[in-house]
């Protein structure tokens, strides 16, 4: 069994939750080793004038 570390991040994007998750993964790649998995914990969004302006994804990223 190979141990993994887990970091928690919030990714954000104006283009959707998938892009928000990818933004978190991209940020994690800057400091983490090999990323082996992502757990999406929560989705939220910012709203202005009745329109979604930013999608946010709280994620846990497993890495070696």
Model segments located where?
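A generic structural signal for short, solvent-exposed coil/turn residues
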Residues: 1, 32, 49-53
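A cross-kingdom feature marking charged/low-complexity
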Residues: 39, 43-64
């Amino acid at each position: 069994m190979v141990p993994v570390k887990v970091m928690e991040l919030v990714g954000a994007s104006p283009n959707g939750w998938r892009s928000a998750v990818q933004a978190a993964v991209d940020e994690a790649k800057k400091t983490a080793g090999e990323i082996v998995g992502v757990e999406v914990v929560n989705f939220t969004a910012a709203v202005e004038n009745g329109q979604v302006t930013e999608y946010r994804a709280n994620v846990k990223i497993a890495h070696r």
